[in-house]
Amino acid sequence: VLIVAYGGMSKLALQVKEVLLSKFEVGGDVVILKQLSPLSFSLDLLKDKYEYLISIEEGIKEHGIGGEILANLLESEVKIDSLIRIGAFGIFGTLASSEERNIPNLDWVIKIIQQRLDVI
């Protein structure tokens, strides 16, 4: 599993990696993007090493970094089994509690991964 994140989701990505290893014995790596465009990592990194790629972002997943990674994968010769894009819900309120419910958290991300991957 390769987990890609940036900004505010960087710490969460590292936590997800630890939970996947400790609870499910699924190893992986984390890439923290320094910039979003152009991508600050090479897709060749994925070649023959990872079956699954998980992108985590605090913005909505539509038109986000996960979509950009997917587009780059489709244009390349690199193949992976599954890309899981995790992002915020598209509707934000004005209250802090609303923001907390909309931005990905550890439990939410692990639940999505469990639903999507057959290895967990």
PLM regions: where:
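Thiamine diphosphate
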Residues: 1-120
